[in-house]
Amino acid sequence: MSSLAFNYIVNLLSRREYSEFELRNKMQEKNFSEEEIDDALSLCQAKNWQSDRRFSENYLNSRSQKGCGVGRIRQELRQLKGVSSDIIDEVLMESEIDWYEMAENLLRKKFPNYNEQQTSKMKQKIWQYMLSHGFRSDEFADLIGQNQSEWD
């Protein structure tokens, strides 16, 4: 194994968590061979310095605090970070995040003057906003029907 490859990964991991996929991409950009990449990653994983599960847990907490719903987080982890669906499912299942409450808080913050007498155009805008942030319709649909006094 190349100590240069190992040192490169350790240097990256000393700053923040990375998924295996991200580390592979960074090492390929630096022209490390597949063997060097595999060896360095295996050693870091054996020492528990790199873990896709731990990365996913941290990513979930970080993105949920920024108002992202489960759908968006799942998509980002899978497509952008290369985390396996099995790990994502486990992390989401074990998460103690109340997605309904999060959707309600996001809705209150973004649309503070909303009430149930709003036009269908406004309701459509809210619907699109919530879906684009990764919330499922069942997590916010009944919130749109609540009136402002129930939000206070």
Swiss-Prot record:
InterPro entries: RecX_HTH_1st (IPR053926), RecX_HTH_2nd (IPR053924), RecX_HTH_3rd (IPR053925), Regulatory_RecX (IPR003783), WH-like_DNA-bd_sf (IPR036388). It comes from the Bacteria. GO terms for biological process: regulation of DNA repair. Its main location: cytoplasm. It holds the Pfam family RecX_HTH2. Keywords: Cytoplasm. It is found in: Cytoplasm. GO terms for cellular component: cytoplasm. Transmembrane segments: none annotated. HAMAP family: RecX. Belongs to the RecX family. Modulates RecA activity. This is Regulatory protein RecX. It comes from Haemophilus influenzae (strain 86-028NP).
